[in-house]
Regions:
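Short amphipathic alpha-helices within nucleic acid-binding modules
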Residues: 430-432
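Short amphipathic alpha-helix segments
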Residues: 355-372, 395-402
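Acidic, glycine-enriched active-site microenvironments
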Residues: 436
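Conserved short beta-strand edge segments in small beta-sheet-based binding/regulatory domains
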Residues: 371, 440-455
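Short proline/glycine- and acidic-rich turn/helix-capping motifs at secondary-structure junctions
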Residues: 396, 400-413, 450-459
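Intrinsic disorder/low-complexity segments
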Residues: 170-176, 371-398
Length: 459
């Protein structure tokens, strides 16, 4: 690239730009550095910009470069933004409805069928049921190799681990052979809702001449399956495309006049400070699939939390409704974009060895940052700063160490997982400090270490 004149990153908010395995980097930061070295412009494009990009534009500069925000409030041509309707599932329940689909969504689907149009439905949970639960003892079958609940898949009658891929044969109630692995009761019931169950409900609801196409990680495992399903949707006269987040962006079908979100609450309540931002991105992106042709589009979002800032922001097509609330919370809790965040992950088959090493690393980090608190292994994520309390003002001038603590997913693929979260002021040389501390801590046989600076995944 001898004569680089312009760098463009499309959909810059995408988490996939952050490399999760070694070498760990963010493509946005690499591109920004490259642009400075070559003296060229960097354009970040997104309908839902990241909090980091917005903060830099608000400040006007970052790392010696000028940042400017340019907005395009209207769609190109004559197309207008779709109307967003929020269906309150609490009212649906009180009115006696037990259907997967609210009355507004049912009416909208009927209209799509009548006019021979197309619809896109988002449900970000693959499988048939989220999990199985014994109605007598409360047991939820978990993976033998991970600390995660197993997802039930109706087509194959299996419980599958979406962490390691393990699969177990099962017969849920009321089928013959149903048995709880703990108490033996036959009342092993399906709980929660997956895309397979929504697909079955759609096929029972809609006329046979309406194509129902499911697109998720299970239906797109084979080579070319993704493209084949999209071609089926494109060729159909009237169709409903049901899928997980993979259908939320990049689809441009003028015949799609309806987008439905089966349950928006799944994305809102993840144990992650970026959960709100990711939920807004997902909902706003999928809403953009409607009304891209001559016919106006509608979006129906089903939720038990209609007053959440994220839901209100999507309804109004106004990110600021959510952003102001989200950034206030991040500023108060000291999360990016107001601080730098690093995640030190330690894992191994020997729980004691992994625990010992993560404690040693935490001790060395305190030495590196000049903190004198004795490390303690906390039982849950972010229970405190290892015995040291800092105010927001103090943190801006010195790092803070949270943990060590077991990860949210405590065990994966037979390996016990612990982590340390480090918060530091903007401009702090986190990489150098972490490298020095980890090097002094040494290693343990069979125990691995991963250091993720400016981390996105804390699970």
């Amino acid at each position: 690239l001898a004569d680089l004149g312009l760098i463009v990153i499309d959909e810059e908010h995408e988490q996939s730009y952050k490399q999760g395995s070694s070498p760990r980097y963010h493509a946005r930061e690499v591109a920004a550095k490259l642009a400075r070295l070559h003296g060229c412009a960097l354009v970040l494009g997104s309908a839902t910009p990241s909090a980091e990009a917005l903060a830099r534009c608000e400040t006007g500069s970052h790392d010696g470069a000028r940042w400017t925000r340019v907005e395009m409030p209207e769609r190109p041509g004559t197309a207008c933004l779709p109307e967003v309707i929020v269906a309150d599932l609490r009212r649906e329940f009180v009115s006696g409805s037990r259907s997967i689909f609210s009355k507004p969504l049912l009416d909208a689907l009927d209209e799509v069928v009548e006019k021979r149009q197309k619809a896109v439905l988002l449900h970000n949970r693959r499988g048939f049921a989220s999990f199985l639960m014994c109605r007598e003892c409360g047991c939820v079958p978990t993976c033998k190799h991970c600390s995660t609940a197993l997802t039930y898949h109706e087509r194959t009658h299996t419980l599958e681990c979406h962490t390691c891929g393990s699969s177990y044969r099962v017969r849920p109630y009321p089928e013959y052979g149903s048995a709880c692995p703990k108490c033996g009761s036959r009342y092993l019931a399906k709980m929660g809702l997956g895309t397979q169950q929504v697909e079955d409900a759609l096929r029972a609801l809609l006329p046979e001449d309406v194509a129902v196409i499911r697109m998720d990680a299970d239906s797109t495992r084979t080579k070319g399956a993704h493209q084949k399903l999209l071609e089926q949707f494109d060729a159909a006269e009237c169709a409903v495309l049901l899928g997980t987040q993979m259908i939320a962006k990049g689809l441009d079908f003028p015949e799609v006049t309806l987008v439905g979100v089966i349950n928006a609450d799944y994305a809102l309540k993840m144990p992650d400070f970026r959960a709100g931002e990711r939920a807004f991105d997902l909902l706003e992106q999928v809403a953009g699939r409607a009304g891209r042709g001559e016919d106006p589009g509608r979006v129906i979002i089903q939720t038990y939390l209609p007053d959440e800032p994220v839901i209100r922001a999507v309804k109004m097509h106004d990110r600021s409704v959510f952003t102001e609330h989200d950034l206030d919370m991040r500023r108060e809790a000291l999360y990016p974009p107001y601080v730098r965040l690093a995640n030190v992950l330690v894992w191994g088959r020997d729980e004691r060895a992994a625990r010992g090493l993560v404690m040693r690393i935490a001790e060395e980090l305190r030495v590196e940052f000049g903190l004198d608190a004795t490390p303690m292994l906390h039982p849950a994520v972010e229970t405190g700063s290892a015995g040291v309390e800092f105010s927001s003002r103090e943190l801006l001038s010195r790092p803070q160490i949270l943990g060590p603590t077991p990860c949210v997913i405590e065990r994966a693929k037979d390996r016990y997982r612990f982590h340390i979260i480090v918060k530091a002021p903007l401009g702090c040389d986190l990489s150098g400090a972490l490298s020095a501390a980890v090097s002094r801590a040494g290693t343990r046989p069979g125990v691995s270490i991963a250091v993720d600076v400016d981390a996105y995944d804390l699970m």
